[in-house]
């Protein structure tokens, strides 16, 4: 089952979300971040930056991912709460 959710809320940076099984894909309206994909089973968060770089951040808890998705500034939340506190691997 796949769900596509489109959000148009002025204070939120999410453009759309796709929920497909264990993956949640988020398109982000940010000066630095382009997309984020969260694996609900492994808690890995894969982030694509606007410059094309792709990084996978490990063991990001569901509640932290939810706060990231709903943050007024997803880039700021990401930098302060995910990028600096989770192990990561460069994917591309």
Segments from the language model and where they lie:
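Short, Lys/Arg-enriched N-terminal segments with co-localized hydrophobic residues
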Residues: 1-11
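Acidic/histidine-enriched, beta-strand-rich ligand/metal-binding domains
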Residues: 12-92
